[in-house]
A protein has these predicted regions:
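Short, polar loop motifs at secondary-structure junctions
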Residues: 1
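Flexible "cap/lid" subdomain of the alpha/beta-hydrolase fold that forms the substrate-access gate
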Residues: 4-40, 44-167
Length: 167
């Protein structure tokens, strides 16, 4: 999110769907003159990369996806341990402005606690990097983050189910 664009949303969350993001990436690669390319995605970007490969397969030379499993499979396998570790999946999909308001009450605390829970090295982010994360963690960024998760729990699941037979 950060300095990236944050389009207005709608009730379907389509502007934040992985399909919409993948289409943006495909258009960018076309604009840059890349008819085909190797594609790597990590975490949320891995979901976008997967959608790009499904919708624009003729452009993909190879695909590497890191640190994800299919969203529907993750929801289907949800148990207490998953819900505890991935609580934000369920918190961020709540209707606006609930998560935005709660996070916005102390955005620095929320961001530091989330980033601090990633990995096993508590000081992995330099003070300069953390300052930049905090600079970017605006109300618009918080809303865009929530919209990404809302799309994942709604329209992205529909898109994935519609073409489940594609590799």
């Amino acid at each position: 999110y950060g300095d990236s664009g944050k389009p207005p949303t709608n009730s379907s969350h389509a502007p934040y769907s992985k399909r919409n993001m993948a289409n943006d990436m495909a258009q960018l690669m076309d604009y840059l003159g890349h008819e085909s390319f190797h594609l790597v995605g990590h975490d949320r970007g891995g979901r976008v990369a997967h959608r790009l490969a499904r919708d624009h397969s003729a452009h993909i030379k190879s695909l590497t996806i890191l640190d994800i499993a299919p969203t529907a499979a993750m929801y289907a396998a949800t148990n207490m341990a998953f819900a505890r570790a991935y609580y934000h999946w369920f918190f961020l999909i709540q209707p606006a402005p609930l998560p935005e308001t709660l996070i916005g009450g102390n955005p620095e605390f929320y961001l530091r606690s989330k980033i601090g829970s990633w990995g096993h090295v508590s000081d992995a982010h330099t003070p300069e990097a953390m300052a930049d994360y905090l600079r970017c963690f605006t109300p618009e960024t918080i809303h865009a983050s929530c919209e990404d998760y809302r799309a994942a729990a709604t329209i992205d699941l529909i898109h994935d189910a519609d073409d489940a037979d594609k590799k």
